[in-house]
Amino acid sequence: MARTKQTARKSTGGKAPRKQLATKAARKSAPTTGGVKKPHRYRPGTVALREIRRYQKSTELLIRKLPFQRLVREIAQDFKTDLRFQSAAIGALQEASEAYLVGLFEDTNLCAIHAKRVTIMPKDIQLARRIRGERA
């Protein structure tokens, strides 16, 4: 038997079209100005999941170096004025800070999941720190 080319067909499944109100019908019949195509948008959560996968793969520092350096210097001024830092020292502080924050956010996420939520909240961070023994 010879193969035949299949043609595309419209799907027949799905919901039946509802009757439109008069205002909607009038709005639809009005001519649209130009063929302006609305920009493509991903479904909520898709981009977030893509970013999670991207940042879990990578090893680079996520906080910019100069803002972090300014923060370190600002905090250090409370203890002693005119302190100087080697660039390696600031790098080590940033590496440790980011590792701590990533771990804290992982624990925070587990606390939110335990509460049957997907959104982390301040109370999740407080619980994670309490369990770790960082805050009594």
Curated annotation (Swiss-Prot):
Modification N6,N6,N6-trimethyllysine, positions: K5, K10, K28, K37
> Which residues are recorded as modified (N6,N6-dimethyllysine)?
K5, K10, K28
SUPFAM superfamilies listed in its UniProt record: Histone-fold
* Disulfide-bond pairs as recorded: none
Q: What is its main location?
A: nucleus
Entry's Pfam families? Histone
Where is it located? Nucleus; Chromosome
**Entry keywords, A to Z:** Acetylation, Chromosome, DNA-binding, Methylation, Nucleosome core, Nucleus, Phosphoprotein
InterPro entries with a match to the protein in the record: Histone-fold, Histone_H2A/H2B/H3, Histone_H3/CENP-A
Which SMART domains does the annotation name?
H3 (SM00428)
Molecular function per GO: DNA binding; protein heterodimerization activity; structural constituent of chromatin
List residues modified as Phosphoserine: S11, S29
PTM annotation: Acetylation is generally linked to gene activation. Methylation at Lys-5 is linked to gene activation. Methylation at Lys-10 is linked to gene repression.
Residue segments, region Disordered: 1-43
**Any idea which residues bear N6-methyllysine here?**
K5, K28, K37, K80
Describe the family membership recorded for this protein in Swiss-Prot or TrEMBL. Belongs to the histone H3 family.
Assembly, per entry: The nucleosome is a histone octamer containing two molecules each of H2A, H2B, H3 and H4 assembled in one H3-H4 heterotetramer and two H2A-H2B heterodimers. The octamer wraps approximately 147 bp of DNA.
Q: What is this protein called?
A: Histone H3.3 type 1
Q: Which gene encodes it?
A: his-71
